[in-house]
Swiss-Prot record:
Protein known as: CBL-interacting protein kinase 25
Lineage per the UniProt record: Eukaryota, Viridiplantae, Streptophyta, Embryophyta, Tracheophyta
Organism of origin: Oryza sativa subsp. japonica
Chain residues that bind ATP: 27-35, 50
Residues covered by the Protein kinase domain: 21-281
Cofactor: Mn(2+)
Length: 514
């Protein structure tokens, strides 16, 4: 079934060189890309590999669309959103390696009615999928992403029966909306378009997504379209006039929710937080509870038999794409191709001339132990601080913070665990990394923080703290009110002088020499 990448035409894999993946059959094809089933050679994991021809993208004017899709997928780490593993490119093609969702499209699971047509799903099944859809959309909005093309074709089901939102090619980012006051582009599938979208008066991306969720829910429950006219202009008129009927089988709670979802006035339409408070929605709803483990993989706390269910993800692409650390090669990188688990911007790929010209911000590999760093970059940054007071040593950059300590690693880890316990957070420790997670989930997901300890010298370590998930304001409050105060006694208030001929003297001397 699988073959090495490099031979064949048509439905066979394109001629590219890779040591990481084997290619299987063609499983999908669109205007801009072909999607192949693939398998990671080392792990055996099945993946979907989206292959795009760079010349065709330019010819069809699709370069910006693909850039946006990759940028959006970099932002998203949620169990109900299809995840991206890595991006590879050579002079001719771009390959996006993604999660393979074996179950296929959601509409395949509709029942058959007496006349042979689709009859939708049972109410409890539709509710479960709708709950997962709303959870995913709420998370996307919290990350500043509006999907803009929510429809049944873009809702997949995995082998465990969980919904996965896919295809962010038409999505918009919140900063686009802020620049333009409202989104202007009419995009998406007519049946799922909110009335304000096709009226071309500007629209709120979040409210348009809520409308599309309402259409999805109606179709899930009935197997029919709420606005059944096939002619686009008449369809738009039905949508604008809100001409749809809830079947008698709908309970009052369900009918109330559907009418609020399909409210043509966006200012009166229900919001995501309000959906989550509706009685029909809350029935049996279990919030997605997940955390990012010490290997940067997404895990659910709701797995079977008390074991965490694994949502595998090789790296936190959000963090790694802005990492200031030195690039480190990934083992098994394909010859003749670039690879980045953090998905490099396509503007860089477009400028690429040869296979050695693209510097990629790859994340550091996991450190099961605490080896001496080969680079003294972190030490140099601290040693060159203008003062050695506490505020200077708690160096903060966006969603990252780091400080230097002379305390034993075991004491630092114990203190981090203690601080987490004081605010009822959980703490998981593996080697020299502590993962701290909030026990309650908000609209933006549970706050998750990673604290890694690195050895600088025999006497000093650096602790790097970064937000992995959740609300940024909540992260900063935790750092300001809990973390800094709790760690105050462990942070060095002055770096020791260099020791000639031993200790950390070589490092300090190098720093002073600069």
């Amino acid at each position: 079934m699988f073959r090495s990448m490099g031979t064949g035409t048509g439905t066979k894999p394109p001629a590219m060189t890779t040591e990481r993946y084997e290619f299987g059959p063609l499983v999908g094809e669109g205007n801009f890309a072909k999607v192949y089933l693939g398998r990671h050679r080392a792990t055996g994991e099945e993946v979907a590999i989206k292959v795009m021809d760079k010349e065709k993208l330019v010819r069809l004017g699709a370069t910006e669309l693909i850039k946006r899709e990759i940028a959006v997928m970099q932002r998203l780490r949620h169990p109900n959103v299809v995840r991206i593993h890595e991006v590879m490119a050579n002079k001719r093609r771009i390959c996006v390696v993604m999660e393979y969702v074996r179950g296929g499209a959601l509409y395949r699971y509709f029942r058959r009615g007496p006349s042979g047509g689709a009859a939708g799903l049972r109410e409890h099944e539709a509710r479960r999928f709708f709950q997962q859809l709303v959870s995913a959309v709420a998370y996307c909005h919290s990350r500043g992403v509006f999907h803009r093309d929510i429809k049944l074709d873009n809702l997949l089901v995995d082998e465990q029966g969980n919904l996965k939102v896919a295809d962010f090619g038409l999505s918009a980012l919140a900063d686009m909306e802020r620049r333009e006051a409202h989104l202007q582009t009419v995009c998406g599938t007519p049946l799922f378009l909110a009335p304000e979208v096709f009226k071309r008066r500007g629209y709120d991306g979040a409210k348009a997504d809520v409308w599309a969720c309402g259409v999805v829910l109606y179709v899930l429950l009935t197997g029919r379209k709420p606005f059944p006219d096939e002619h686009v202009s008449r369809l738009y008129r039905l949508i604008g006039q809100n001409q749809f009927q809830c079947p008698p089988s709908f309970s009052p709670d369900l009918a109330r929710l559907v009418r609020r979802l399909l409210q043509p006035d966006p200012d009166r339409r229900i919001t995501i937080p309000e959906i989550m408070e509706m009685r029909w929605f809350k029935r049996g709803f279990k919030e997605v509870t997940y955390y990012i483990d010490s290997n940067d993989r997404l895990r659910s706390l709701d797995g079977l038999d008390g074991e965490p269910e694994l949502y595998d993800s090789d790296t936190d692409t959000i963090e790694s794409s802005s990492s200031s650390e030195s690039p480190t090669p990934v083992a098994g990188t394909p010859r003749g191709m670039h690879t980045s688990v953090s998905a490099p911007a396509l503007s860089e790929l477009d400028r690429m001339e040869d296979s050695a010209s693209l510097p990629l911000p790859l994340p550091l590999p996991p450190r099961p132990r605490m080896p001496r760093p080969k680079s003294l970059n972190a030490f140099d940054i601290i040693a060159s601080s203008p003062s050695f007071d506490l505020s200077g040593l708690f160096e903060e950059r966006g969603e990252r913070m780091r400080f230097v300590s002379g305390a034993p690693v075991a004491d630092i880890i114990a203190k981090l665990q203690e601080i987490a316990g004081m605010v009822s957070f959980t703490a998981r420790t593996k080697d020299c990394q502590v993962s701290i997670e909030a026990t309650r989930n908000g609209q933006k997901g549970a706050l998750a923080i990673s604290a890694k300890v690195f050895e600088l010298t025999r006497e000093l370590v650096m602790v790097q703290v970064c937000k992995k998930a959740g609300d940024t304001a909540e992260y900063r409050r935790f750092c300001d009110n809990e973390l800094k105060a709790g760690l105050r006694g462990l942070v060095v208030d002055a770096l020791p002088p260099p020791v000639e001929g031993g200790g950390h003297g070589g490092a300090a001397a190098a720093a002073e020499a600069e």
